[in-house]
Amino acid sequence: EGPVEKDLVIIGAGPAGMTAAIYGERAGLKTVLLEKEAVGGQVAITPEVENYPGFTRIPGKTLVDMMAQQTSQYSEMHLSEEVREIEKVEDRFHVKTNWATYIAKGIIIASGVHNRRLDVPGEQKFYGRGVSYCAECDGYFFKDGKKVIVVGGGNTAATYALYLHTLGANVTLVHRRDLLRCEQRLKESMEKLGITVLWNSVVKEILGDKVVNAVEIEDLKEKVVKEIAVDGVFVAIGYIANNDVATMLGLEMDREGYIKVDRQQRTSVPMVYAAGDITGGVKQIVVAVSEGSQAALSAFEDISSPYWKEEKKLVQSR
C-alpha cells in the first residue's frame, strides 16, 4: 500500500498525545496517533492519582483507559507502532513506522520520558528479579512483609513507598539528601505510616544470587557503607527524555535533552509541536493535557490559517 495522507501525525499516546488527538480531530484535522508501546505513558504505571481534578483518587491505569476510550471516539490510535524514520520533504513530513508510511502537514511530539537508572553494579543483572521501576506492575510480588527499598525523594518515590506499604511490604525509602522534594501531603502520609527514610544515602551495589537479597548503601555524611537485606529495589530517581524523533528532525533541545517550545508549543522547526513531559518542566497530568490541547490548536491555526489567525497578524503588525 502507498503512503497514508494525514493533516497531523501525533507521536506518543500519553495524556498529552491523546488530548492533542481529540482536539485535532474536533478542529477538523485528519489525525493519527502513533504509540510504540501501550497507551498511557508514565500515568499507566502510577498506582494512584490524587491530584487530577474531578477524581479524588483513581488508579493511573483506569484514568488513561478512560482517556483512551474517549480518544478512540475521535481519532485513529495505533498501538505498537514505532516511528523509525522521519524527514521533511518540501512542505510535508514523511513518517515511516514499522507498519506504514504517513505524509503529514504537521507533527506533534508527545513521546514522554523513561525512567532514569541508578547505574550501579547488579541493577541490570537483577532487573525483573527484584529490581523494578514500576511499583504498580511489580509491587504484588513483595506483599506480606517482604523487605523493599524505594530509591528517590520525589512524588513518584513517595507514591511507590505508600503503595508498597498498603500491599503489606516492609518499606524503607533511600534518599541522597536530607529533605524530600515530594508534595507535603505525601510526606505527611509517609510519616503517619512510619515509613523509614535513610537520609543522605545512596545505593552502591545490588546483591543477590538468582534474585535480589541485599543492597550496599553508603551514608554520604558518615562515609560508611553497610549491607542491608532486602527482597526488592524500586528505583524512582527521575526521568530521561524520549527524544529520538526530536533528534531525527533536528529540533532545538535544552541541556537535558528536552524539546524547547514557545507558549503555543511550537518547536524550532515550523509545523512541528511538542507537548507533555518531553518539553521538560513540571511533569504533571494536568500540564500534559493542557500542552496537548494547545499543540493541536496551534497546529490547526498553522495548517488551516483560519480568519482569526490573519486578524491576529494584522493586530500584531499595527
Label for each model-derived stretch:
Residues 12-17, 112, 152-154, 276:
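Conserved phosphate-binding and hydrolysis motifs of nucleotide-dependent enzymes
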Residues 1-3, 119, 125-142, 237-287, ...:
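FAD-site-proximal beta/loop scaffold in flavoenzymes
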Residues 71-97, 101-104, 166-263, 303-318:
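A Rossmann-like FAD-binding core segment of flavoenzymes
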Residues 78-142, 153:
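Glycine/small-residue-rich loop that forms an oxyanion/phosphate-binding "nest" at active or ligand-binding sites
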Residues 3-74, 156-183, 198:
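Beta1-alpha1 glycine-rich phosphate/pyrophosphate-binding loop at the start
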Residues 6, 29, 105-106, 129, ...:
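Nucleotide donor/acceptor-binding cores
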Residues 5-7, 80, 144-146, 200, ...:
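Phosphate-coordination loops involved in phosphoryl transfer and adenosine-cofactor binding
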